[in-house]
Amino acid sequence: MFLAFDDTDSLESMCTTFLATELIKALGVYDLIGLPRLMRLNPTVPWKTRGNGALCLRLGIGRGEPTMVGELDDMPVYSYGRTAEEADPEFVLTVAEDVISRLARTEEGASPGLVVSAAKPAQRFYWQAVRGIVEKTDVLQELQRLGADLVGWEGGRGLIGAT
């Protein structure tokens, strides 16, 4: 199950990678599958945030040998190369929505987007977001095609980077 989010910080505060650590802790009943994916988006868009990055975590019950990928609160964080079972999308969505609602800097202009999906979007969305401008209407059509769950705050512009 893929959990992706974007536009949670402002030019003044918050950090997408910090939010990822909070989500990993809050969703600790699940394992990381693979490494967290940090996407550096087009730095020339007029609405960029501090780092202009989005993050994607794949969550589930891991299978095989775990690899230690870091520490959070003095506890090791492990990642698995394969999944034995996907995470429950409703649970992931509920927990992630709560964490993002509490920590996103909407009062400072953030326009967060959260996507939970069993399938990845077409690769062209990634490359277009890195190199150009992506229209939100195109993203919404792709997310609908995938059957993804999504939440947007303050216009949900972050759905673009989260796709």
Language model region names:
Residues M1-T163:
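Conserved mixed alpha/beta catalytic, RNA-binding, or beta-rich assembly cores of soluble enzyme
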